[in-house]
């Protein structure tokens, strides 16, 4: 029989599990299994699973919480997440999160939406460093912003600087204009493009 453990989970978390200082942590799901054997601490949440770690909210079909101080979170199946303070949304097949380093790794069909900067990016792998506000995208990278469309196999997005570095057959489309090179740097404030190596382009006047 499955039971909603929301209240029970809160009791377990706040009464018996050590925390990272200054980090609020809670979780809920339809069912739970777990153990606290030394060196093998693991809690498995299934069915409408949800974890909140400070400003980060994660939801998935299954979530595994492991390690001392619940350091590692592994979300599997229809994963959705939101960094509430920065207004960043995630969607992916699988997400692994390190609460100490504040690094999220998204695997499979993955989307990152930065609502503040009005950017949507998709790829097969995303690594987001929340402390540095840097995202790395790999494999079938697509980034959309207003009339700007960027494609490549590898990209680095620096959120604070609002810059995008593209490599691996990069292409940038600005309305009807097209730019290709070995490496392309995009200023997302102005949509200006800087290119290096085998530069090609077409501009519609």
Predicted features by range, described:
Residues 1-205:
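Mature-chain termini and adjacent capping regions
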């Amino acid at each position: 029989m499955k039971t909603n453990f929301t209240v029970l989970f809160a009791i377990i978390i706040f009464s018996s599990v050590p925390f990272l200082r200054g980090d609020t942590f809670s979780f809920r799901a339809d069912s739970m299994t777990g153990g606290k054997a030394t060196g093998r601490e693991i809690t498995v949440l299934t069915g409408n699973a949800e974890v909140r770690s400070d400003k980060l909210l994660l939801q998935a079909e299954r979530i595994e919480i492991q390690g001392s101080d619940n350091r590692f979170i592994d979300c599997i199946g229809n994963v959705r997440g939101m960094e509430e303070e920065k207004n960043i949304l995630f969607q992916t097949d699988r997400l692994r999160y390190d609460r100490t380093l504040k690094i999220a790794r998204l695997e499979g069909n993955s989307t990152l939406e930065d609502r503040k900067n009005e950017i949507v990016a998709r790829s097969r792998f995303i690594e987001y460093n929340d402390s540095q506000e840097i995202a790395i995208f790999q494999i079938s990278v697509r980034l959309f912003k207003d009339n700007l469309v960027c494609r490549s196999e590898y990209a680095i997005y620096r959120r604070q600087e609002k810059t995008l570095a593209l490599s691996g057959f990069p292409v940038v489309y600005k309305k009807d204009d097209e730019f290709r090179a070995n490496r392309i740097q995009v200023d997302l404030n102005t949509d200006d493009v800087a290119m290096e190596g085998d530069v090609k382009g077409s501009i519609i006047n």
